[in-house]
Structure formats: structure tokens, C-alpha cells
């Protein structure tokens, strides 16, 4: 099976994104436009191509992609124009389907797959999924094992079913299940419990040396924070000339370099103890992932 994400924002027809999304929810479908003039509904690919291939000079690549790759039981993330997230379980693969309502309202959604769709609270959406919505491409795979297993677990949880078998064995360690942003958030929360207040404006993508800066309300000291995951190394020597002390966290202890003068390593066991003591109030996505690996 595969995990995908799709933007519902048709450019043709009425090009009303809100109306198109509401239509998809009501009909239990997700998809794209590339409509034919005859609007002949069909599940036979060759019939669709015979007409659409002429209209669009063969440039129907996204429809071909959906036809080839989307199958029953795949999972698809989507997002409405107001920023709400949804997770969909595919019921059946590609078909050309334009309802009477779509024709009357000129809703440019016709190359579709039927699915069951559940709204997901933003607190339950993994950072990897959110990041995948930044590119403008309409439809793409989310090729991430953690996101796949979490999405299966989340579907089972929200639908109150056991539809998917979740591979817990590959993620027995919570830090293998958390993505980069979730691990940063965890350290963010830990430091605040230790009396360090994070400076929100310092949390920028172009801050190369630090993930964010923190300040002590009692002493006024400012410190940097760096977090890496997986097999990515943290080089302590990069901070030898830093004007700040720097907190470092790498859950797999991938530290290199000899500088110890102004770096403070947050030990893995310290973070595990923090998780255990704080799991009742940690972000729900982290709570879900703790349940997933239990």
C-alpha cells in the first residue's frame, strides 16, 4: 500500500476551492479535473483516454499517475481551504465520474477515487505530513515509513477499527517514531520545564547553528539549542567559538568533536524520563505515538 497527499484546488471550471472540497466530502471522493466534453462516466481507462487525450494533447499525466498507483486501502491526506486536515482510506481506484451537481456547478473534479474521509485535529497531524503540503504539486506520495505506520494507526484509532496491521516492531523506540519537528518540540517543552523560555522569533529555518534560542528569566542568560535525529551527527566543535552556551540533543548519541567547553548534552535517559513523567500532557501526536509503540 501507499501513502499520499492531495491538494483539492481545481484550476478549471468555477475554480471554487471551498465548493470543490465540500463536494468531495459529500460524495466521498478525492481527485482532480481534466474533464471531458461528453462527461461520460466510466471505469474503463481506454474510454477516458480516447476523448481526454485529444482534448489535452495527451497531457494527462496526473490522471495516469492516479490510475497507476492509487488502489484500495491506500491512505491519502488532504487539507481544506481553511487549513483543516483529513485522512482518507481509498475504497476503490481511479474512475471518471462527474455527477449532475458537478456539471451544474462547474466543479472541476472528475478523475477521482472513492474513499472514506475522516477529519483529523491539527494536533494529530505529523510534521512530515504538514511539510508535504508545502510544495504546490497536486498529488504526491509521502514516502516515509514513520508517516505510513502512524497514518495506519491513526486511521484505526479514529475509525475505531483494526483495519490496518501496524508495524510496531520497527519502531520500538519512541525516537525512531518521532520526526525531526516532533523531536524539536519535545526538547522545546523539556527546556521550559527546566526554567528556560524559548524565544519564538529565533525559531527560523535560516538559523543554521541553532534550532532556537532560550533565555533564563532569573539570570537573563541566552543559550542556543541544536537537535538532530536518526544518524545525523552533531559536531560539538562547531560551537567552540559560539557566544552562547548550547544545549545539544541527539537521541542516538551521534556526537562528534572534542569541544566540551560551552556545550551541554541533554542525555537520552533524561529525555525518556521526561516523556514518562509528562506523557499525560504532551502533544497528542506524541501520546498517540507512545501508544503505537507500546
Predicted region positions:
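Mixed-charge (Asp/Glu-Lys/Arg
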Residues: 1-72, 77-294
